[in-house]
Amino acid sequence: MKLNKYIDHTLLKQDAKKKQIDSLLSEAREYDFASVCVNPTWVEHAKKGLEGTDAKVCTVVGFPLGATTSAVKAFETKEAIQNGADEIDMVINVGALKSGNLALVESDIRAVVEASGDKLVKVIIEACLLTDQEKIVVCQLAQKAGADFVKTSTGFSTGGATIADVRLMCETVGSDMGVKAAGGARSYADALAFVEAGATRIGTSAGVAILKGELADGDY
């Protein structure tokens, strides 16, 4: 199994330096990862750094709280794509979901999907904050809104991906959508377990260590 093609090689820390981003890009070129995932401010730099490779540039929208308005998320999406983003990982409005305002949750996702054009949209549900029923509901809403993936976590909340969450999300969306496990893979065994549970993408800062079969010390 080519695990490298499952990995979104990630650096989303707010204090990330240019040299760290450059290292991320160099590793993506060397290990042929599916994508790099960086904050919007680094998208243009990442696009230039990955020219001539198959690696995509993934960025985040409404990150990490999901509490900006739909209009702001749509603008972020459009600007990111103009700057070279190939994939958008957006955070849902968790508060709206918890309040039972499902129409707002769906329209919020749809705003990003519509702004993204033909680019891939992954919907971060922040599973660690949700009940199982809420996880099911929001995955269904993401599917209804036309998103391409559901994603477990930002990596900035109280927990990351779990095998149980990945299985539940896969069962909910079926084969129509991808499932991204983020914030829980720190070793080759972890990554393999997520793939075996149904994950089609893994978000991690430990991509190199995973491929080397080493235990990583990163949180995301």
From Swiss-Prot:
Its EC number is 4.1.2.4. It holds the Pfam family DeoC. It catalyses: 2-deoxy-D-ribose 5-phosphate = D-glyceraldehyde 3-phosphate + acetaldehyde. The keyword ATP-binding does not apply. One of its GO terms (cellular component) is cytoplasm. GO terms for molecular function: deoxyribose-phosphate aldolase activity. It is found in: Cytoplasm. Pathway: Carbohydrate degradation; 2-deoxy-D-ribose 1-phosphate degradation; D-glyceraldehyde 3-phosphate and acetaldehyde from 2-deoxy-alpha-D-ribose 1-phosphate: step 2/2. It comes from the Bacteria. Catalyzes a reversible aldol reaction between acetaldehyde and D-glyceraldehyde 3-phosphate to generate 2-deoxy-D-ribose 5-phosphate. HAMAP family: DeoC_type1. This is Deoxyribose-phosphate aldolase.
